[in-house]
């Protein structure tokens, strides 16, 4: 409490001191206005020191009053003063009269002004360097150069309050670096020769440091675009403007500058055509995409003299860049859309020629390998931005504006798949594509698709897009198989593809092993890729262009992980793509036999009871494969955490929208539409329970006097309407007479309409035996009274309570035959009744699972477990059934209730239909369901207590919980009820797996400018003080925003992502 009070006092005193300095600045500003121009240098120096004192004294006060903007304004006004005078001298009259005037010549005046200007810029550069050092010293940051590992280490050592202050300090350093870049850029504008290039390089270095310090800011990329425009590099200029817009805090001026840049590019694009009168007609004529412009190679030959290979490559690369920028300009401005396919054909042809210049080991694209790889990555990034910009949120737009987005969105996808298809095709042609400079770009593209499965799947594609998609995925499969054929070096322990659809499966420990590559650093903060970047570790040092085998192997692994994730949604000529884990090969239209066991270890050995009947079970059946898949990987749960290979139950927890159809693999719940699917499901479940029947033979010896069976089944007569039977079957070392099984199965087989049977199996102990007849009469009296009541919905709740039966004569055991001469033993009859427990019979005789929707809002098939014999436990542990080993409760996901058949053991623990586990103390079971005619309420699973007063002594009837009253529910069961109906949503294309997308639009809004800008316009510079309300970095709404060291938003690759 004392510390908190001291902190408040310190903050208050700092605020007051900053406020006092701010008042002094107001008085000095009035004096400066009265002084006029030129301003007094001493007064400027004093004002600058006052602003700096406020920033260092109270960062909160500084951000609230935007102190950094007027501080930069002091320097910028001085810069404008020198630029204005230099331009005036250059534009002054050159008449003889003016030259004869005594005094310094014009050249001397310009030289003197430039010297003064450079001196001022150098002094201002030193001031901002010193301020960065002071800020870092105050907040305990290292005084050396900025690096990712130092930042991560320092941020991890701070608590909540200190972390917020440090992040504010880093943002101040970020802005100071931008100001330093601007000062260096102005130096380069008035420098000569090599000095100009050095200053521009220095400015770019400052901007890149600022971008790495705060990747979510678009300001550094905007300034880098301005530097690129000085060298007339249209490709890099457009790339940087795109990056400036596709971040969490976009720079608004970039959109206007993009319009100017695209207008200049249009003029460059027109110069590529043959100078003829009909050249403009060929662009929009009938021969769309054919002959619109001359070939790049032909243009080189027409040029005349022979040129070396590098020069030719540079010219071809420049021509492709002009075409490619023009293509993106059409998509961005949505103008001249009728020429899009002509430009796309020209761009595609140009790219094919560019990437055909030698192999990956030679000079490529006219530059070295690392620069070639960077060029391809930027091509991919610009294509991704065009798709992202065309599919951004349409909130607040009119219907006409939304319709206008349809064609650009479709065209951007067509261009992306067509151009990247050429890159993949080139990778296939290489002998060893694992070391190709194309791979970084391929990684960026496939991870983006894995994070956006809706884009990978396609939404209403036209014929042209469908063709280019098929071509791309064909090359995609061939490329992957070619790399796989090189050996297992790159595919051992490939990360699971769930990282692109479920980021919640990853924690901080795992991000340490997710190696960030140079392309990840290059695209850090790029909004469409944030889900894939979320799980990457950016704390290590990196250097562009130098990577070893570790980085190459990591890149291949991530490409394969993305590829495996995409196999669930992509199609090649309407054929699904699968990955065969045994053959290490991607297959088209051929489903591998081990489709459900490709990423799991072999199952543990079964118990002796299971081994006795092992020969009767078909392990190759889909159901047994699914059962084994659920059971696998449980032996080492206590020793390690498996994240990249989660269990099926774990995947249900986070991705419960996928269900398994035995004849069709995994599908969405709304895709199980045909009766064939229901038949396959019914047959698979029946086959599963028949396996249990085989095991029950020889494992159960049960007998109950015939009177018990008569009393039990007396009220149950064949009904002409649906009957829902909830049964709790005793599992004891007693025997049931054949008459019980005969009556029960006769009831099941003679029902003329659907019967929904849900059985819950309880394990009890035989304590204080008593005559069976009195036991049945006392136990079944409440049930008979309930059955005798009116039945509005013809529902019969049948509950066989805890039986304490022993000393039964085996004389009652006899065999029973029924239905067609087939003979059934009592054991088979009892087991078959259990096997049909969780199913309802449809009107056409097909069996389906009942009460499976629960509170999840989705429909899914029940999970199965490997059939394991339950043995009687008499060790005083409360009658808890065990299989091989006792499994703790934590193995069950807390958010879902697996729907299991009665008697089925999941994860080694006997469970009921509803797993509302709350009390770790054992407690006896109690049926909470309502009487006939009321909605079904699932019983809560509560463990039985140790044998005590409840199970000893006299037989106490169950306490009435008043659940039979109309509208009444027990307190413990309210809100837990399951809907008894099972509805399957249908889909027009049941073979498709749906996706919710990843929602990567973020807070950025990109309204379409909708205008053509005259060629006389110039790109806007960076006058921070002229429009402070649009500054994203000093806006008080963003003051509390933390540095996005890791993406705080969602997951798709749904994600995380973020890769």
UniProtKB/Swiss-Prot annotation:
Residues 806-826, 927-955, 987-1015, 1040-1059 are annotated as: Disordered. This is Nonsense-mediated mRNA decay factor SMG7. The gene is SMG7. Expressed in flowers and at lower levels in stems and leaves. Keywords: Cytoplasm, Developmental protein, Growth regulation, Necrosis, Nonsense-mediated mRNA decay, Plant defense, Repeat, TPR repeat. Interacts with EXA1. It comes from Arabidopsis thaliana (Mouse-ear cress). GO terms for cellular component: nucleus; P-body. Residues 806-817 have a biased composition (Polar residues).
